Amino acid sequence: ELVTLSGAHTIGQAR
């Protein structure tokens, strides 16, 4: 999972 600059939001997250 790659964490964006927002810190909380992640890309490709399926949780």
Curated annotation (Swiss-Prot):
GO terms for molecular function: heme binding; lactoperoxidase activity; metal ion binding. Signal peptide: none annotated. InterPro entries: Haem_peroxidase_sf, Peroxidases_heam-ligand_BS. Binds 1 heme b (iron(II)-protoporphyrin IX) group per subunit. One of its GO terms (biological process) is hydrogen peroxide catabolic process. Its EC number is 1.11.1.7. It is found in: Secreted; Secreted, Cell wall. Belongs to the peroxidase family. Classical plant (class III) peroxidase subfamily. Removal of H(2)O(2), oxidation of toxic reductants, biosynthesis and degradation of lignin, suberization, auxin catabolism, response to environmental stresses such as wounding, pathogen attack and oxidative stress. These functions might be dependent on each isozyme/isoform in each plant tissue. This is Peroxidase 8.
